[in-house]
């Protein structure tokens, strides 16, 4: 098992190209309460959809790195992170990219609702940003939650992300386009 980063409670390991790991994603992403925060309640995932989205990531073909979050040895969700190019995160009008050489985008899903509102997401985001700054040499990290996801926005602000701007019609969610908030954390 390839550990990406860990502390005494949280471990994030690389997604494996195997049915056990894909089945975790089906369990999380078919739960309508979880879907409300990830692609919408109108789009619960089945096994084929999980394979379509995550198989090439698990195989290392897609550059997005996916890690399964384990809290005290229980798989509870996942993170994704990837190097970004200038302009990819709608940041050109609010960030001078000449000041930043290496940037990453990231996101997180706590799929096990028993771990919601327990600080696990905040702790995982803190560990992930430390990993990206210290091991991947990032000097800026972006995340873009939807404007209505106040819990996520608070979580990101707790670990030092700042709101930069609203992105109109950022993503399709429950069959309609929703606005997002571009947030960034610098080294």
Summary of predicted features, one role per range:
Residues 1-2, 169, 175-187:
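Terminal substrate-recognition subdomain of acyl/acetyltransferases
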Residues 134-144:
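Conserved GNAT acetyl-CoA-binding A-motif
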Residues 143-153, 170-177:
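Conserved beta-strand-loop-alpha-helix junction that forms the acyl-donor binding cleft
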Residues 117-131, 153-158:
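Conserved acetyl-CoA-binding loop-helix of GNAT-fold acetyltransferases
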Residues 10, 74-78, 178:
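Glycine-rich phosphate/pyrophosphate-binding loop shared by adenosine-nucleotide-utilizing enzymes
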Residues 48-115, 186-187:
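Acetyl-CoA-dependent GNAT
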Residues 156, 161, 183:
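Conserved active-site tyrosine of GNAT-family acetyltransferases
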Residues 1-55:
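A short, well-structured alpha-helix characteristic of acyl/acetyltransferase catalytic modules
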């Amino acid at each position: 098992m390839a550990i990406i980063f860990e502390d005494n409670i949280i471990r994030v390991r690389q997604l494996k190209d195997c049915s056990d790991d894909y089945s975790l994603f089906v369990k999380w992403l078919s739960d309508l309460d979880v879907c409300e925060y990830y692609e919408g309640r109108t789009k619960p995932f089945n096994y084929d959809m999980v394979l379509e989205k995550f198989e090439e990531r698990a195989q290392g073909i897609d550059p997005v790195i996916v890690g399964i979050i384990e809290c005290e040895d229980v798989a509870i969700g996942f993170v994704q992170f990837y190097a970004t190019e200038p302009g990819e995160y709608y940041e050109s009008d609010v960030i001078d990219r000449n000041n930043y050489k290496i940037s990453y985008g990231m996101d997180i899903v706590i799929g096990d609702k028993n771990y919601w509102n327990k600080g696990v997401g905040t702790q995982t985001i803190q560990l992930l940003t430390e990993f990206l700054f210290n091991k991947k040499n990032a000097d800026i990290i972006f995340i873009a939650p939807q404007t209505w996801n106040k819990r996520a926005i608070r979580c990101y602000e707790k670990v030092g992300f700042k709101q930069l701007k609203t992105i109109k019609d950022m993503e399709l969610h429950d069959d309609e386009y929703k606005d997002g908030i571009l947030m960034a954390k610098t080294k």
